[in-house]
């Protein structure tokens, strides 16, 4: 399921993030790439252990925690600490599939995170740069994504995708992965659609007795499928 989620960041949060990132020290983005994807990757990235990356990542996680749409669509069990990249001067990232497992060393040790869901949070105004579209190959064909600053897109971690060359300005974004309680993308889509329908029915016909039954169906399916 490819899903844009608008306004994950407020204007104040976006301004704070950009102020931090504008003065940050960027490094070669290939530091987090696997062997194959490193050959296709050309961008700049904040080192994961930098103070700016940790502070900015914490802000993003706080924003995600307030997004009911993100939670409903992803049903996250673990979220890999958010990372930040920048493309400019013709930089791009060729077609690749994200590593199946990432190792979170932010708390000491190395906690495995299965990358069920990939996410990109756009931090640059789309009018401030040319190119930089996130191109995703999914079940319904090729999707090109270039969203307003503060908007998020999520898509299955199994997807073949690329970032087109940025020929003017700079494209700054946050990216991360989530391990869902539901490994299967079709199950995630089904529960998301059911949750959205329940919410709409609650608004349109509050107190309808069928809502209790539908909510029970949702939770019983989650109980049957969830890996927690």
Swiss-Prot record:
Fe cation binds at residues 96, 98, 161. PROSITE patterns: FE2OG_OXY. SUPFAM superfamilies: Clavaminate synthase-like. Its cofactor is Fe(2+); L-ascorbate. Gene3D superfamilies: q2cbj1_9rhob like domain (2.60.120.620), Rabenosyn, Rab binding domain (4.10.860.20). HAMAP family: Hydroxyl_YbiX. Residues 78-180 form the Fe2OG dioxygenase domain. It comes from Xanthomonas axonopodis pv. citri (strain 306). The keyword Zinc does not apply. One of its GO terms (biological process) is DNA damage response. NCBIfam families: PRK05467.1-2, PRK05467.1-3, PRK05467.1-4. GO terms for molecular function: 2-oxoglutarate-dependent dioxygenase activity; iron ion binding; L-ascorbic acid binding. Its EC number is 1.14.11.-. Binds 1 Fe(2+) ion per subunit. Keywords: Dioxygenase, Iron, Metal-binding, Oxidoreductase, Vitamin C. 2-oxoglutarate binds at residue 171. This is PKHD-type hydroxylase XAC2942.
């Amino acid at each position: 399921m490819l899903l844009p989620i608008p306004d994950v960041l407020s204007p104040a949060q976006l301004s704070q993030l950009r102020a931090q990132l504008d003065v940050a020290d960027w490094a070669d983005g290939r530091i987090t790439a696997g062997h194959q994807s490193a050959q296709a990757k050309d961008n700049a990235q904040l080192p994961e252990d930098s103070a700016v990356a940790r502070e900015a990542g914490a802000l993003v996680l706080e924003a995600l925690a307030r997004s009911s749409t993100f939670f409903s669509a992803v049903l996250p069990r673990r979220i890999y600490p958010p990372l930040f990249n920048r493309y400019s001067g013709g930089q791009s990232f060729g077609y690749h599939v994200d590593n199946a497992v990432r190792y979170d060393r932010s708390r000491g040790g190395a906690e495995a995170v299965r990358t069920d869901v990939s996410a990109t949070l756009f931090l640059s105004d789309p009018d401030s740069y040319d190119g930089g579209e996130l191109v995703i190959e999914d079940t319904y064909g090729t999707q090109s994504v270039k969203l307003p600053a503060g908007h998020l897109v999520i898509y299955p971690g199994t997807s073949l995708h690329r970032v087109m060359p940025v020929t003017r300005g700079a494209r700054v974004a946050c990216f991360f992965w989530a391990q869902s309680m539901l490994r299967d993308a079709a199950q995630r889509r089904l529960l998301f659609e059911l949750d959205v329908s329940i919410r709409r029915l609650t608004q349109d016909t509050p107190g309808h007795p069928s809502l209790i039954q539908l909510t029970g169906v949702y939770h019983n399916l989650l109980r049957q499928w969830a890996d927690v």
